[in-house]
Amino acid sequence: MPVIMGTAGHIDHGKTSLIKALTGINCDRLAEEQKRGITIELGFAYLDLTPEVRLGIIDVPGHERFVKNMVSGAAGIDFVLLVIAADEGIMPQTREHLEICSLLGIRAGLVALTKTDMVEEDWLELVHEEVQTYLAGSFLEGAPIVPVSAHTGAGLEELKGYIAELSSTFAPDRRSDLFRLPVDRVFTMKGHGTVVTGTSISGALRLGEEIEIVPSGHRSKVRGLQVHGTAAEVARAGERTAVNLYGLEVAELERGEVLAHPQTLFPSPVWDVEMTCLSSSPNPLKHRTEVHFHHGSREILAKLFFLDRDKLEPGETAVCQVRFPRPLPGVYGDRCIVRSFSPLQTVAGGRIINPLGRKVRRHSKDMETLSTLGAATGEELLLAQLRLAGRGGLTVAELRIMTDMESKLLDKTLQILGGKQLAFQFDRDDKRFVGADVLDGLAGACLEYLGEYHRREPMRQGLSRAELISGFGRGMHPKLVHFLVERLVKSGQVLLEADILRLPGHVVSLASDQSGLRTLMETTYVQAGLMPPTTKAFLEENGLTAKDVAQMFRLLMEEGVLIKVSEEFYYAKTAMDEIIGRVRSFFESNQEMGPQDFRDLTELTRKFAIPVLEYLDKEKITMRIGDKRQIRKR
């Protein structure tokens, strides 16, 4: 994995000339840039420090009008080369670029004092002292300050030495294995088709692989790859990459989108961000402020919502919800920059702590968990994200972007949490997990729901799984309800009998008139045997209405006394068991059974035989083929 160095500094301080002197590569690719002598777009170069180590260099524009491009380039760098012209010293974009680098989480770098051939030695010493003083307290405090001249070559070898030394301190596996490439250019190349370019943030991309453009959702395959202008089989994190895509038109793509492997990024219209307002900001950031929001290669208008305050004062840090006009993809730990409208300047920056946020009320109970996400790592971070997700749970793919964990580490951590009974996989198809604290809360709520149901429906044994899902489980993943029920049944907190769920202490409570009705109905249907009365006949004979008996029919079915064969007929279970027994005995010596065979077997008239045969088919005891029936294997 290459190390990436980015330049920073004021316009016309010699960043591009210095890179050309170091590498021989002119980073100004636009005719306008070469004519005007300023960098507008990002420039890219490389320097082979050793046969094994190639340094990628991103040359960012210094003009204040092109700060959005500077942010795009700085997002993927490991360390910064702050360029300050000896004849001018520290200037406005010097300050803004350093602040942006700090907000983007860059924690290492060095300084080049350029144009030293244009100043006297004593002036150079004064500028050196000024820079040292300015950098005190910043991440560049104590960093090497190297006087150089791109014109004469003075100091270049010394600068290369410091760059090589700093590059050697970065671990090769410092980035995750989730491939992402923010698109900064889209164009058509004659004979090749659509090409996108960008700098890979993490992971790797190979020829022929399928990719997804996020958030648009377009799919394509990698037709060709170039890394630093050379054809390649694979592009890795930190490399300047051009990707030739199959079957996509330029109009279908735009700067700011992200290339990724399919179903690895999940756009959201809300991000939770740990936001810091710059100490140098002239004003606080107010709740509901609309801002220019920069992330990767995208600039978009967004609104900031503070959950525990009305404004964020300069120098303060707080959790903030960033809400976008459309869903965008992010990953835990990604850095972002906020610029004000008027004047247009950098005022804040932040770090994504939840890329799958959801709108919450101010002073929400989620604030306690959100406030811990910035410093959380490993198991603690995983559990916090599962807690925020609540009853919906999270898939492994979602947890990957919510923790930025390398895939093998994530799988191992989930196994450890499962062993500790702190996280549970309730959907093996989607690999979806829920936290133990969420599950415990749901278990308590489910027991309360069942208790309330028993109080409301004293004549019912309980309720079915389907009723529990449509009632208590509304808005929950159905598989989570099943998982929860299994745990409650296994622990003995809930009883499951004939698909009816009830609390252990619940018994059906009947008033005296209901007890009499129960006896009447049970006696009538049991004594009727294989030819019970129709529902209508039973009601008329006993002066009852359908409303009078609805609950009792349901209770007797739950208790296993009656079986509903059709809207017209209920059978005593003992009678139906007798019919099923006769049918099974018949098939011990016969391959098929016709309607007349069944009537002869049961002595039922057509009025009873047809609904009973249809019931046997529905219960998968028999199978109808034409006008015959065959027995189903148990």
From Swiss-Prot:
Superkingdom in the source lineage: Bacteria
Chain intervals for the UniProt region annotation (G2): 37-41
Main subcellular location: cytoplasm
G1: region residues: 9-16
One Pfam family in the UniProt entry: GTP_EFTU
An annotated Gene Ontology molecular function: GTPase activity
One BP term from GO: selenocysteine incorporation
Region described as G5: 149-151
Gene3D superfamilies, alphabetized: 1.10.10.2770, P-loop containing nucleotide triphosphate hydrolases, Translation factors, Winged helix-like DNA-binding domain superfamily/Winged helix DNA-binding domain
Any one GO cellular component localisation term in the record: cytosol
Function: Translation factor necessary for the incorporation of selenocysteine into proteins. It probably replaces EF-Tu for the insertion of selenocysteine directed by the UGA codon. SelB binds GTP and GDP.
Xref: NCBIfam families: selB (TIGR00475), small_GTP (TIGR00231)
Name of protein: Selenocysteine-specific elongation factor
Source organism: Desulfomicrobium baculatum
Gene expressing this chain: selB
